[in-house]
Each structure stands twice: as structure tokens, then as C-alpha cells.
Design a protein with these regions (language model features):
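Initiator methionine at the very start of the polypeptide chain
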Residues: 1-2, 284
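Active-site nucleotide/adenylate-binding loops and adjacent lid/helix of ATP-dependent enzymes
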Residues: 2-187
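Active-site flanking residues adjacent to catalytic metal/cofactor-binding acidic residues
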Residues: 136, 198, 212
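A residue-level signal for conserved active-site and pocket-lining positions in enzyme catalytic cores
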Residues: 147, 200, 214
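A long amphipathic alpha-helix within ATP-dependent nucleotide-binding catalytic cores
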Residues: 161-209, 230-233, 237-238, 242, ...
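C-terminal active-site "lid" helix and adjoining low-complexity regulatory extension at the edge
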Residues: 204-284
Length: 284
């Protein structure tokens, strides 16, 4: 049985997925796309992945992988010094009773679009009232930055937005966002998984830094960050379950064991996994 590390992608990989695949090929990894079931069981114990929730849950369940998630209440438990606004973890039912503008997003996943709503009446009615959401007073960010964190240090970073408009650019080594990110990570200490993504930004009104949100490293856009360094973080965040560190166990995602071909379906005919013998062409 091969012990060569594998890097797995969904059929329609994003630009970040392709860049990470190129980095994995350079490391000599076995890079594959998985068009559908069955998932090759020979990959168990040596696989890492990058992809959306449904794909990640299906593959992780089949291959006994551990996926690391940030805590749902991370933003809600941070002091105002780090958030620059009041944030609370509540239920969707409670959010529907909002009578003032609030920024509302699912605490996990993307079950509905995040955004500012004038009140709670426009929130999705088809979702259960007990669904946990983050609710915050609206703020505007002049610039936003993505920090890929590994073992308590910022491993890779990129700007990704200016006044809410996508605008990615590499960060110089001593950029203030890196210092603020390090301060946040030091404050959270054991309250973070060893591999995670933190988004931080500069508030438009005060010019102060604040945490935007935390995300799973296994499906976060790299933007203009170094793909090699991002891959280090992704591999820790999505890898064999038997390799998970004890300190990361509280952050291990409960994979649903989904067997949903829609999560892995390609425009091509479903079949066995397809090897990537050379770096893929990056497209948008």
C-alpha cells in the first residue's frame, strides 16, 4: 500500500484549489480530483483535502479524516477591543425579531448569505429557528486581510478587500495587520485550532484594527498569499484523523458521513478519481 501523501479536490476546483494543487505537485504529492463515489479507500490514512463543506464532509467521513473548525462563538467571546463592535451568538429565531439593522450570518457554513439587514423579517423562513447565527452591529472596513495561522503564528497573509471591493495584494513582512493578528492569536491561545484562518480589517470610522471573522483553512481563499505556505496550513486543517493533536480534538468537525453525489458531481461523467500529473492551469 502506498504511503505517498494525497491532496484531494472537488471536480470544479477554485483558483485557490488549483494553486494549492500546483504546490502539492511540487512536493511530490499524489494530487487528485474526485468526480464521485466510490471514494478510493486506499487513500485512507494519507489524504488531505481542499474543498467546500459537502465535499469535505463526504470525503472526510469516507477516509477517516479530521477537519478543524474555529469555535462558533469565537467572535462573540472576544473583547470589544478585538472586534470593534458588539457581536453575539444567538439563534435564527431570535435574529428574526431584530427591529434595527444588524449584520447576520450563519455561525457555521453558508446556509444563507451574510449581510446587513434593516430588520429580522427578511431572514430565511425555511431554516430552523434553532439554527445558530452571529449577529453584530454593522460596521464598515476600509481594508480587510486574510491571515492563515499555523501553530500560533501567521504563516501566510494577503489583503483581500478595500472598502468592501475585492482587491487582493501580498502583505509586506512588517505590515500592521500581521502584528494585530499575532495579538489576537496570543489572546486566544488554546481557544484556536492549530490551523485556522483569521480575517482582520481596519474600521473605516476609527482606523482601528478589528477581527472580521474566523474561517476553516480547508476552504478559505488564499487570495495573494504564498500558496506553499497556505498549503502547510490546509494540510494541518484537513488530514488523517490518527494524526490529530490532542489540543486540536475540541475543534475537530463532526463529519456527517454524507453520501451525496451532488457534492462531488462534475460536468464530466462520474467515475474513478483522476490523477493530476502536472500542475493545473489556474483560471478564475
Amino acid at each position: 500500500m502506498s504511503t505517498r501523501r494525497s491532496f484531494l479536490l472537488p471536480p470544479r476546483a477554485t483558483t485557490t484549489g488549483r494553486l494549492l494543487a500546483e504546490a502539492a505537485v511540487r512536493r511530490g504529492m499524489d494530487v487528485r480530483t474526485l468526480p464521485g463515489h466510490p471514494i478510493p479507500t486506499d487513500l485512507r490514512g494519507r489524504a488531505h483535502l481542499y474543498g467546500g463543506e459537502r465535499f469535505a464532509d463526504a470525503v472526510a467521513s469516507a477516509l477517516d479524516m479530521a477537519l478543524l473548525d474555529p469555535p462558533l462563538d469565537l467572535l462573540a467571546t472576544l473583547p470589544a477591543y478585538f472586534t470593534g463592535r458588539h457581536v453575539e451568538l444567538i439563534t435564527l429565531g431570535q435574529a428574526r425579531r431584530h427591529r434595527v439593522p444588524r449584520f447576520v450570518k450563519p455561525a457555521a457554513g453558508k446556509l444563507f448569505p451574510a449581510g446587513v439587514r434593516p430588520n429580522g423579517t427578511g431572514l430565511p423562513s425555511h431554516l430552523p429557528a434553532e439554527l445558530r447565527v452571529l449577529s453584530a452591529e454593522p460596521v464598515a472596513f476600509a481594508e480587510e486581510y486574510r491571515l492563515h495561522v499555523l501553530d500560533g503564528e501567521v504563516r501566510a497573509a494577503s489583503r483581500y478587500a478595500v472598502f468592501g471591493v475585492l482587491d487582493s495584494a501580498p502583505l509586506p513582512p512588517k505590515h500592521p495587520a500581521l502584528g494585530f493578528g499575532a495579538e489576537v492569536v496570543n489572546h486566544l491561545a488554546s481557544g484556536l485550532p492549530s490551523a485556522v484562518v483569521l480575517d482582520v480589517g481596519i474600521l473605516s470610522d476609527s482606523g482601528q484594527f478589528a477581527v472580521v471573522e474566523a474561517n476553516e483553512a480547508w476552504f478559505s481563499n488564499a487570495y495573494a498569499a504564498d500558496a506553499e505556505r497556505v498549503l502547510d496550513v490546509v494540510m494541518r486543517a484537513a488530514g488523517p484523523a490518527h494524526e490529530i493533536r490532542d489540543t486540536d480534538r475540541p475543534f475537530a468537525r463532526r463529519t456527517a458521513g454524507i453520501r451525496d453525489d451532488d457534492a462531488m458531481r462534475s460536468a464530466q461523467q462520474p467515475g474513478t478519481s483522476r490523477h493530476l500529473s502536472a500542475g493545473p492551469t489556474a483560471t478564475t
